Amino acid sequence: MAKREHAATAALKRAQLFRALAPAALARLALNATALNLPRGKQLCRSGERCPGLYLLVNGRVMLSIGAPRGASKVIELIGPGGHIGLAAAVLGVPETVTAQTLADSSLLLIPCEALLDCAADNPGFALELVAELSRQVCGLISDIEAFSLHSGRERVAGYLLQTAAAGGARPRPVTLPAKKSIIASRLSLTPEYFSRMLHELIAAGAIAVNGRQITVLDPDRLRETSH
């Protein structure tokens, strides 16, 4: 196996989405995949454009957003290593509904739509995993709608910080926000000014400590009370 194909196979094997695939199926996908190395600020795809396939993020960070003709935009999701972009559009064969842009130098694999769907047709377990992943995305969007519609901005900030801290482990230790505070604010449907004000209030309450993009949850119980 060529070095490039070996690296692609290893990247696919690490991603949760492809865990149901046997080595031979992974190797076939890797053979059809294209490796991309993109600088920070590069667009992968734009809303309304044809979807060439599924992007698997190997390293880096990607922002998914929607925009209005007047220039306003809303961050939908931040994708980290092991995540993917374009699954729904690739499966349905429809144009992209979001714009994807790298927030850091990023390495990705592009799996063409035809190769992805052929793999699903040949591997029922993988097809079920695609259905499960699309279902998780729907549940996530419903949770977002609930938060944006029924939770205060303060509750959204507290909930996000608890979720971020939980990903960093049980002990209180600094965790780094995955993007600039203005981008996090947009993800939570808040203005940057409001997001900063909520951070200062939580600092004053002794719930968190902030050092740039590093945040330490000092009092999880107090933060949980704020998130409900």
Predicted regions and their residues:
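Cyclic nucleotide-binding regulatory module and flanking cytosolic helices
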Residues: M1-P39, H84, A89-V91
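Cyclic nucleotide-binding regulatory domains
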Residues: L17, K42-A104
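Residues that scaffold the ATP/ADP-binding catalytic core of kinase and kinase-like folds
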Residues: S65, L87-A88, D118-C119, Y160, ...
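Cyclic-nucleotide recognition modules
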Residues: E77-C139, S143
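Polybasic "coupling" helices that flank or enter modular domains
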Residues: L103-D105, A121-P192
